Amino acid sequence: MDGHSYPTSIADISQWSRDNRTTTLQANIRFMEYVVLNCIGSNATTHRGMVLKGGNALRFAFQSPRSTKDLDFTVAGNEIPDDTERLRSLLNDALRFAERRFRVKAKCQHVERKPRPNPGSTRPTYSVSVAYQFEADRYFHNFEERNNI
């Protein structure tokens, strides 16, 4: 670990938590944010079509103290479908990278299209929740069954 804004492996979580004076739960959440960002960046479609923005973009890129509880993205171009089920499928394809690279299973648990915030909005907004399980967790081996994958 080199002063990262996120723990970059499961093995880093405990030390990152101590170094940043935070709970293990918060360190787990930060690690999963890192995992999700890696998954999105490793999938050709999401890499081209989703741009990280907001407090976590500042935290990740510039080690800013500003942070939020979610990851905010803007869609670039027409790569990302404006359809709940197609978006879920695309994100689940990207999240499959997590198990190979990070020993974490992850999938979209909830995808919901939000109403446009104002009439001038040009892009739709979605709320997406991701379920995850670490390899050492007791439910890791039946994650797919428990999450209807």
Please name every model-derived segment.
Residues M1-I149:
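Compositionally biased terminal segments of proteins
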